[in-house]
Amino acid sequence: MIRVENVSKYFGERQVLKNINTEFETGKCNLIIGKSGSGKTVLMKCLVSLYTPDEGFIHFDNRVLRHLNKKEKVNLRKDIGMLFQGGALFDSMNIEENVMFPIRMFQLSDYKTMKKRVDFCLDRVNLKGINNYYPSQISGGMQKRVAIARAIATQPKYLFCDEPNSGLDPQTSIVIDQLIKEITHEYNITTVVNTHDMNSVMEIGENINYIHEGQLWWKGNSENVLTTNNQELNDFIFCSALTKRLKK
């Protein structure tokens, strides 16, 4: 579990996160949603240590992020898998090298063991046998699945996904959502997804955190998100659905 305790963040005199308190549960898909400029991306960056909160604490189970020394932060980083917006594969590396990259970076295994782990992860995302391909030789949806394989290569306890369906068609987005949800449940990972895609909210939103103007305005799940009386959230849902319809 990840617990956010009284977290605030400032850029100069502007407060972009205002006393956020929430929990991201283990074995569930925890979503951070909100309009552009709401603070959801800033919160995500605080969780993965790209930003440091000016106030408050972030707890990774029994580890408090602010209190960790350099070695302890490296050990925590080994427990974190990242799925970046767009996938962020290395074009100069083949698929096997891309998936193997985080294992090599943390020197977690010998080559034979790493190779076995890569094969397992690619098989898990239904991409068996593409080890020697390069990212430019496969589709965008396949690239995203490779990115998921890379994210789970180190057997993480925590998985962070930043707009995982960005640039994907609706059918491929459903596949990616289902894969993230399956992996979360199968490996009992604490998964945090930053998204504005309402299809993702309905498909995998087991613990939804709606951020508005830097504050946590609503918390719930996909079963009650459409019946809430929160006007700001209702406006967000309507605008998201309208935007998606206009893009078709």
Where are these regions (language model features)?
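Conserved ABC transporter NBD signature motif
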Residues: 56-64
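Conserved ABC ATPase "signature" region
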Residues: 111-129
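Catalytic Walker B motif of ABC-type/P-loop ATPase nucleotide-binding domains
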Residues: 159-162
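Helix N-cap at the start of a conserved alpha-helix in ABC-type nucleotide-binding domains
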Residues: 170-172
